[in-house]
Amino acid sequence: MSRSIWKGPFVDGYLLKKADAARASGRNETIKIWSRRSTILPQFVGLTFGVYNGAKHVPVYVSEDMVGHKFGEFSPTRTYYGHAADKKSKRR
């Protein structure tokens, strides 16, 4: 079930402050964040965020298409190695 409209999008407060500071400084630095649950807002477009996936910060450049999604969607936490091969079929 999606979030009700009257509540508005969820964004951690410190994230807004960091984004405003990055825009004011004009530098193109990666902003390290741990808040995977925060919604991407239009004011984040053009900034690069380092979204923590449990092991490292994955760089995510925010584009207009990402607005409304969560940061965690763009930083996978699990590594997929593929399905194990069947030993019988390998012998042939």
UniProtKB/Swiss-Prot annotation:
One of its GO terms (cellular component) is small ribosomal subunit. The keyword RNA-binding applies. Disulfide bonds: none annotated. Belongs to the universal ribosomal protein uS19 family. One of its GO terms (biological process) is translation. GO terms for molecular function: rRNA binding; structural constituent of ribosome. Coiled coil: none annotated. This is Small ribosomal subunit protein uS19. HAMAP family: Ribosomal_uS19. InterPro entries: Ribosomal_uS19 (IPR002222), Ribosomal_uS19_bac-type (IPR005732), Ribosomal_uS19_SF (IPR023575). Protein S19 forms a complex with S13 that binds strongly to the 16S ribosomal RNA. The lineage of its organism: Bacteria, Pseudomonadati, Pseudomonadota, Alphaproteobacteria, Hyphomicrobiales. Keywords: Ribonucleoprotein, Ribosomal protein, RNA-binding, rRNA-binding. Signal peptide: none annotated. Pfam families: Ribosomal_S19 (PF00203). It comes from the Bacteria. SUPFAM superfamilies: Ribosomal protein S19.
